[in-house]
């Protein structure tokens, strides 16, 4: 049975901080959703096109490994992204966004209101933590559920827990975090997710996805 557009869940990745990991999280969670057998479609609203480029790499990889499931990532201008969502029927749409959200507050608001869950990735660094607090408050003011996701976490660095506590003063934080793993980067370089290669970080990504899926009422 084809997915019902009215039942499509929309997962938005949002952050005003460059390098926070929006595109990476989009790729990781979309591949986890596909592995779960969901009809997941990506929407790349970032002019850098990293998410869409990942799909192209995946298609090249599938030529030698056709057993790898197909992944579809559509492209839309940020100003048109909320309208583009209305044209997608799937189990899940994963949305990647640009950094300069302040350049188009109307589009930012429209995307937030159109989403079922907003994830705000953040590296465990003081500058990053400070920069993402405002967007969490914005999402909360608009009445949409939002969670921080700690990203590129080094296991032996104590700053991760202090960052978690600081973020928790503003909004909820996903219990699991994305580690700083070269195997995550290597998987994405081939258009894959680490859950598909079972590399270091696969269990962490699976845990983040499991929590997101629960919050989306898809579990």
Give names to the regions the model predicted.
Residues 104-125:
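Inter-motif core of Ras-like GTPase G domains
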Residues 2-20, 27-105, 109-110, 188-189:
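P-loop/Walker-type NTP enzyme "switch/lid" segment
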Residues 193-219:
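NTP-binding/hydrolysis catalytic cores, primarily Walker-type P-loop NTPases
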Residues 129-151:
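Conserved C-terminal guanine-recognition region of P-loop GTPase G domains, centered on the G4
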């Amino acid at each position: 049975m084809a997915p019902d557009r009215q039942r499509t869940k929309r997962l938005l990745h949002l952050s005003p901080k460059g390098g926070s990991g929006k595109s990476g999280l989009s790729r990781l969670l979309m591949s986890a959703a596909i592995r779960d057998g969901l009809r997941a479609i990506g929407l790349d609203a970032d002019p850098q096109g990293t998410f869409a480029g990942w799909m192209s790499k995946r298609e090249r990889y599938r030529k030698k490994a056709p057993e790898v499931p197909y992944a579809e990532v559509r492209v839309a201008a940020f100003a048109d992204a909320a309208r583009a969502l209305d044209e997608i029927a799937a189990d899940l749409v994963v949305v990647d966004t640009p950094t300069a959200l302040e350049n188009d507050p109307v589009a930012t608001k429209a995307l937030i209101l159109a989403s079922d869950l907003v994830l705000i990735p953040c590296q465990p660094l003081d500058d990053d933590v400070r920069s993402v607090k405002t967007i969490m408050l914005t999402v909360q003011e608009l009445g949409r559920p939002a969670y921080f996701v700690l990203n590129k976490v080094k296991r032996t660095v104590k700053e991760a827990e202090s960052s978690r506590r600081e973020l928790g003063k503003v909004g909820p934080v996903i219990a699991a975090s994305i580690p700083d793993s070269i195997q995550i980067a290597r998987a994405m370089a081939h258009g894959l997710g680490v859950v598909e290669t079972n590399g270091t970080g696969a269990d962490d990504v699976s845990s983040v996805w499991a929590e997101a899926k629960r919050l989306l009422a898809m579990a």
